[in-house]
């Protein structure tokens, strides 16, 4: 029985030494950074919706109602970056006035 205990103690000691020598596991790669919006003057409706935190359908409805200014370039609909800021400022003013 003493030899079994001695062998077990020796095995545990060698395992402890191996664990002490082992390098820590590498940290996982960080999540890729969220894509930033392009630094353009005119944004697509989808880009404007993302910046406002709204859905595409709601943003199209705001454009159709005139609440968000937009321009047409051929068949394309674009929203000036300033129109997004103006819309947000109007919302804040309405909320603070109420």
Swiss-Prot record:
This is Probable excisionase. It comes from Saccharopolyspora erythraea (Streptomyces erythraeus). The keyword S-adenosyl-L-methionine does not apply. Keywords: DNA-binding, Plasmid. Possibly a non-classical excisionase. Pfam families: HTH_17. GO terms for molecular function: DNA binding. To the xis proteins of bacteriophages and of plasmid pSAM2 from S.ambofaciens. InterPro entries: HTH_17 (IPR041657), SinI_DNA-bd (IPR010093). Residues 42-63 bind DNA.
């Amino acid at each position: 029985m003493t030899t079994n205990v001695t062998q077990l103690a020796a095995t545990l000691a060698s395992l402890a030494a191996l664990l002490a020598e082992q390098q820590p596991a590498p940290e996982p790669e960080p999540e890729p950074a969220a894509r930033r919006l392009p630094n353009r003057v005119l944004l697509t409706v989808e880009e404007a919706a993302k910046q406002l935190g709204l859905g595409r359908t709601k943003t199209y409805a705001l454009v159709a109602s005139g609440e968000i200014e937009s321009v047409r370039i051929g068949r394309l609909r674009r929203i000036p970056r300033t129109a997004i800021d103006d819309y947000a400022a109007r919302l804040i003013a309405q909320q603070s006035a109420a």
